[in-house]
């Protein structure tokens, strides 16, 4: 369950959130199971945040930093993650259906069991990712950099 204080700061907007993150770098935000559907989190620093089972459907996360974040079982259906950073993120069993991931960096991420059906990952990077049972049906993988998995 999400920490209500963390949610309250996030709801003040990205500028307030990012300032709070700079002031409290030791805190690992807990936004697990939060309903952030349709939220505008573009450019947000969500690095190392716990977003497990969060509802981020149709959220705007372009250029957000989600490095090392826990998005396991999160719903990101229809979200915009254009040029987002998801380096070493835990994305296992998350739903990325119809998501805009153009130019997103997912290097080192764990994608096992994730659903990327119909997603656009063009121009992004999936180097050294765990892809076991990941569904890329009808996804756009043009110009994606994919090197050996772990």
Spans of model-derived segments:
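Tandem repeat scaffolds
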Residues: 7-8, 16, 21-150
